[in-house]
Design a protein with these regions (language model features):
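Juxtamembrane and boundary regions of transmembrane helices in multi-pass small-molecule transporters
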Residues: 2-3, 164-167, 171-227, 232, ...
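Interfacial loop-to-helix junctions that mark the boundaries of transmembrane helices
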Residues: 2-4, 27-42, 70-75, 106-111, ...
Length: 435
């Protein structure tokens, strides 16, 4: 083990102060809408890397560049970047109308009494298929508002149900950036992480549906929601979902999804060939910031590791958390605290990955379990913070439709993250020997 050096963790502190401090300033002092997401996260990481480069004068600048380059020369990082871009292209191909078709198709099958339960299930399915909780919320929350207006269900309950379903899907999706980051960071297969997560997420989802059902039967129903949909547009999502569950290589699954989506969108006349290429490019470019964050975090962490910062952090963790259960709780708390600070679960996972990997080796925890814990706990915290992208996007969407609702109205109805926390803690406490 290298010499422990807590000062080497200064770049992380600088990043958190910049990102969290400016976010609070913009959001709560200057009252800028979605202030946290107006903070340029890439600039914050560049400043943090500059601080890291100014540390440890005994190492020449050229050597520091070489250390950062070695940190990037990792198969998992390259794989992560390529999957990000390919997943973005897939989402660009299938577009908004396909996700809406999924929602309206399922709403058409179920009586109005169960509309909120359907919203939760629809959000689960769409988020698994799209791989983005924010994208799912953007698409489904306006439908949730329509359900609330037509049926008499409370708007906070409808929004909370959609947000819960979106986080369920984001946690399990094979093309979610959090799944990609966790699996590639820990070196495990996505199907193995899916199986680990599924048995934690399913009980939480079932309990959420039970509570939603109880609340639904206490509500007087006034009407229902109906809208045209194109069933054929659901097919690419089905290919991606079942291909991932079957354990087919993620690149093959995404290419099948892109090809099937291209054929269907062109055959139905929903998209012109030129627009299709533009949409693919837009989808891929939408992942550029996430890719750059992964690159910058890898470079920064390489310097921190070289200086002995991670050894100091790990030493403190080892003194506090003992045994496999302690190690799993330590990982969950670590990624959760980073998520609270950054309000971005992908960034939290990317930053926690190298530390969690060393913890896993120390406590003899399998890569699939480590990836599952990182993804699940980041999902829990991200799904409950009132300044997260999911909450802000949901509120913005309903405000545009003329509804007045605050984060604190919605928080009591974020049932899924609450039950997921309970389910995760139970999973940690009854952990088996071969995790």
């Amino acid at each position: 083990m290298k010499k422990q050096n807590p000062i080497a963790l200064l770049p992380i502190a600088v990043f958190l102060v910049l990102y969290l401090g400016l976010g609070i300033l913009f959001e709560y002092v200057m009252k800028i809408p979605m202030g946290f997401y107006n903070v340029p996260i890439i600039i914050a990481f560049l400043v943090a890397i500059l601080v890291a480069c100014l540390q440890n004068r005994s190492v020449k600048f050229d050597q520091k560049l070489e250390i950062m380059a070695q940190g990037l020369a990792d198969k998992n990082i390259i794989t992560m970047l390529l999957i990000f871009l390919t997943a973005g292209a897939f989402v660009g191909v299938v577009g908004r109308s396909s996700a809406e078709s999924v929602a309206y198709f399922m709403l058409s099958l179920i009586p109005a009494r169960f509309a909120v339960m359907v919203l939760f299930v629809v959000a689960c399915f769409v988020s698994i298929a799209m791989g983005t909780s924010v994208g799912t919320i953007t698409l489904i929350v306006p439908i949730a508002a329509a359900v609330s207006d037509a049926s008499g269900f409370g708007l906070p309950l409808c929004i909370g149900s959609v947000m819960g379903g979106a986080m369920f899907g984001d946690n399990l999706s094979f093309i979610s950036d959090t799944t990609i980051a966790a699996c590639n960071g820990q070196g495990c297969q996505m199907k193995d992480k899916f199986r680990e997560n599924f048995f934690i997420a399913l009980p939480a989802a079932v309990m959420t549906l039970v509570v939603i059902a109880i609340l639904s039967f206490r509500t007087d129903i006034a009407g229902t929601v109906s809208q045209e949909y194109h069933l054929l547009q659901i097919v690419p999502y089905i290919f991606v979902l079942f291909g991932g569950i079957a354990g087919i290589n993620v690149f093959v699954v995404l290419i099948i999804g892109i090809i099937s989506g291209t054929v269907i969108m062109l055959a139905t006349g929903n998209t012109a060939p030129y627009d299709l290429l533009t949409n693919m490019g837009s989808g891929a470019s939408g992942m550029f910031e996430t890719c750059m964050v992964a690159v910058l975090v890898a470079a920064m962490c390489a310097l921190i590791r070289e200086y002995g910062g991670f050894d100091a952090l790990l030493s403190g963790i080892y003194r506090t958390f003992r045994g496999k259960r302690g190690g799993l709780l330590g990982m969950g708390l670590l990624v959760g605290l980073i998520d609270i600070a950054t309000a971005n679960n992908t960034v939290a996972i990317v930053m926690a990955n190298p530390i969690a990997k060393e913890m896993a080796q120390k406590y003899d925890i399998t890569p699939r379990k480590t990836a599952s814990i990182l993804d699940t706990f980041s999902c829990i915290f991200q799904g409950m913070i009132p300044y997260g992208a999911q909450m802000l996007v949901a509120i913005s969407a309903v405000h545009e439709l003329g509804h007045d609702v605050s984060a604190f109205n919605i928080l009591p109805y974020l049932l899924y993250p609450m039950f997921l926390l309970v389910s995760s803690l139970v999973a940690v406490l009854v952990v088996e020997k071969d995790v």
